Amino acid sequence: MSTGISTDLHVHFGALNFSKTYKSGLSNRTVSFSRVGYAQNRKLSCSVSNTENVAPKDDERGKDRPLVKMCGITSARDAAMAVEAGADFIGMIIWPHSKRSISLSVAKDISKVAREGGAKPVGVFVEDDENTILRAADSSDLELVQLHGNGSRAAFSRLVRKRRVIYVLNANQDGKLLNEVPEEDCHLADWILVDSATGGSGHGFNWAQFKLPSVRSRNGWLLAGGINPTNVSEALSILQPDGIDVSSGICGTDGIQKDKSKISSFITAVRSVHY
């Protein structure tokens, strides 16, 4: 039996001059083949006998494309749409003052959907202390915690030794950073996320003027702030982040529920960019 590994909706083979063909439904799966044929016209055919869910590591998933984090997810339904489209991270707002805030029980349901689809559930915290964040992360089965406000960021040096952390830096409209990450602990964070001054507002900042600080995390950095299907290609081309974060840019008319067509358009735009 010959075996291939499917990532990013295509099957990789150890052959030269083999063009990749996208197949829906095979994202993040190990695929076994019962028959593989190679004809003289260099066409290869195969029959799939079995597929198995796998969850690639962050650094593996981002090798041929920027990672995608879809945030402000408020239901298992929206999480399923995001995962099916190819999101790598599913973000949830655990902050009562956000219109996209959810309960811990709903967050747990979303985490389940995310994990089953090979994505990582992320909880966004703003003003919570260390103990509150840890309890919420355990209760909701979060993979990462995102520290967005000064209150939550104050617990970073302690949390980063207990949980996988996304640390948020905010930039004003001119692209100037408004806060810093503790340099002595920055390397312990999984990701640095650069957002606009008001996250989830749909407002961005000047990408051309922005300068990424010299501090580095384990995996790299994510870009957020005013990202949508029409401008994500430009944002990626200018700044070339390791991943992109979208929230309001894929929402429907109510600004809360996600729009399937916008999600699809967003993913298509991201996949059109190659560094």
UniProtKB/Swiss-Prot annotation:
Consequences of knocking out this gene: Bushy morphology, reduced fertility, blue fluorescence under UV light and resistance to the anthranilate analog 6-methylanthranilate.
GO BP terms in the entry: L-tryptophan biosynthetic process
SUPFAM superfamilies recorded: Ribulose-phoshate binding barrel
Tissues where this protein is expressed: Expressed in roots and shoots.
Residues in the signal sequence: none
Keyword Aminoacyl-tRNA synthetase included in the entry's annotation: no
Superkingdom of this protein's organism: Eukaryota
Protein name (database record): N-(5'-phosphoribosyl)anthranilate isomerase 1, chloroplastic
Name of encoding gene: PAI1
